[in-house]
Amino acid sequence: MRPRPIRLLLTALVGAGLAFAPVSAVAAPTATASASADVGALDGCYTWSGTLSEGSSGEAVRQLQIRVAGYPGTGAQLAIDGQFGPATKAAVQRFQSAYGLAADGIAGPATFNKIYQLQDDDCTPVNFTYAELNRCNSDWSGGKVSAATARANALVTMWKLQAMRHAMGDKPITVNGGFRSVTCNSNVGGASNSRHMYGHAADLGAGSQGFCALAQAARNHGFTEILGPGYPGHNDHTHVAGGDGRFWSAPSCGI
């Protein structure tokens, strides 16, 4: 696990009469921090103020949806659309339950503080990195979508993996590959419509969990494509991806 960034208490800033601008991470927006007692920390990636609940909308909701994307319910995928509807409320409740918080579906200080504990200054979850999700090139270019979109999709994938990791006892999950440019995909014999070229996909090593346990768990954490043992070319890894449609096939795992 990478070290977490040092958090600055807003109450200390207010008490000292100091004014600091929020720190902006590369390619990640930062919300204006409120100096109210409702917010416990100024985060290096993104800081929420107040609370979010059903009916809320905007960038703050979209940022929340990215972090709870791994809690949509079995077989579902949460839309990252900035609209706090019933599906987002349910995802927030599952996130809260997973971390022992009051599961009211309202994102407030306790929920945000837990997210701050789970994310690094580049907005990735603490147990995964952009480098793990891109072993093809350094700039996310050359895929089926823009580099920015591929990178953003990979961020959502990482938060899904973080949720899955927590559900499986917080044991490390081995990521052997993620984003591929069209060239990288061709070089490894990938399918012409592979979701790797969109930044949606990750190939997982067996780790301590085993391929089948990973494939089975992925069904609960927002992955619409799961391929594993028994599916051609997938006896040596478990492939998980988001994106449109749903296709699960790991016959040796009962999927």
Swiss-Prot record:
KW Protease (keyword) present: yes
Record-stated family: Belongs to the peptidase M15 family.
UniProt-annotated location(s): Secreted
UniProt xrefs under Pfam families: Peptidase_M15_3 (PF08291), PG_binding_1 (PF01471)
UniProt EC number: 3.4.17.14
Cofactor field: Zn(2+)
Residues annotated as the enzyme's active site: H234
Residues recorded with modification Blocked amino end (Asp): D43
InterPro entries (UniProt xref): Hedgehog_sig/DD-Pept_Zn-bd_sf, Peptidase_M15A_C, Peptidoglycan-bd-like, PGBD-like_sf, PGBDSf
Residues annotated as binding substrate: R180
Physiological role: This enzyme catalyzes carboxypeptidation and transpeptidation reactions involved in bacterial cell wall metabolism. It effectively catalyzes the transfer of the N-alpha, N-epsilon-diacetyl-L-lysyl-D-alanyl electrophilic group of the standard tripeptide substrate N-alpha,N-epsilon-diacetyl-L-lysyl-D-alanyl-D-alanine to water. It also performs a weak beta-lactamase activity, hydrolyzing penicillin into penicilloate at a very low rate.
PTM characteristics: The N-terminus is partially blocked as a result of the cyclization of the first two amino acids into anhydroaspartylglycine imide.
Entry's Gene Ontology cellular component terms: extracellular region
Name of the protein in its database record: Zinc D-Ala-D-Ala carboxypeptidase
Chief place of localization: secreted
Disulfide cross-links: C45-C123, C136-C184, C212-C253
Single GO MF descriptor: metal ion binding
RNA-binding in keyword set: no
Swiss-Prot/TrEMBL catalytic activity: Cleavage of the bond: (Ac)2-L-lysyl-D-alanyl-|-D-alanine
Signal peptide positions on this chain: 1-42
Entry's cofactor comment: Binds 1 zinc ion per subunit.
Single Gene Ontology BP annotation: proteolysis
Record: residues binding Zn(2+): H196, H237, H239
